[in-house]
Structure formats: C-alpha cells, structure tokens
Amino acid sequence: MTTLTSRDAPSLGEIKVPAGAVYAAYKPVHALEIDQIDDRSLVQFGFTGAFGKLMIDLESREVLETHDGSTVSFVNSSLERFAECLQFFVDLLSGVEEAGGPEDEGEGEDENEALAQRLEAGIRGIDSRAYREDSYWYEIRWAVSLGDYA
C-alpha cells in the first residue's frame, strides 16, 4: 500500500491505495487529483482500463469509476473494501499462475469459469454491494471467464 495526501482535499487526509498496477484493472496515480462530476466532489486515486478513472467520493467515501468524465458508477463501498477486493483478485490469479495452465482448450474454459465464479463469490463476500450487473467487478469477472487474465 502507498499513502497519498492531498492539499486540495484536507478532509480526505491520508489515504492508502494499492501501490502497484494490477493488470488493466488498476493503476495508481502519482498524485491525487480533485474533480467534480454530477455535483460530487471526487478524488482520483487510480486508473482502470485504457480510459477509466477510479475515484473516491469525498462525502460518501465510496469508490466510483468514470470512463467519460461526466457520469460515475459504483465500484466499492469504501477504499478499504476496494483494496481488499483487489488483493483477493491478485491472490486468486497468483494461485492460478503457480498451478500452471490447462492441458487442453476445453479444460481451460472450464477452469476460467470456475476461477470467475470464485472471484464473484469472493467479491460478494468482501463487499456485498460491489458485484452487480454492468459494474466494475462484474466486467472483471467476465473478462476472467473469457480467459483475459489467464
């Protein structure tokens, strides 16, 4: 974890964010950035995918994402839950890498789906609000099932 501070949002204080990039799912910013979307005061702490931004709502402390800079969608109930979910994801994929790949393609598809189901169950267990259709973790779960993280 890395601690970031923001002079522009002293109410936020110091926040601990995951220190390193996690595939295309998460990349930390070098410095916190303040933004305003939908009348919400947000602090960007990371990136996701090619164009997405991960942000903390200063009022609710929820983690949100935006891909267009004009609307946001829910990711996690808090930065702590986000970090736990991200660590679960990393640990899950690390276990697969250590075990090695499947013998044939059909077996790989079954293993990818089983891995995706474990990811979904883990995310739901950490933050019950985080996994829902068309959400950040939903999209990652489906990418895992398709073998994008194999």
Predicted features along the sequence, with ranges:
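Conserved aromatic-histidine-acidic binding/catalytic patches
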Residues: T48, S70-F74, E111
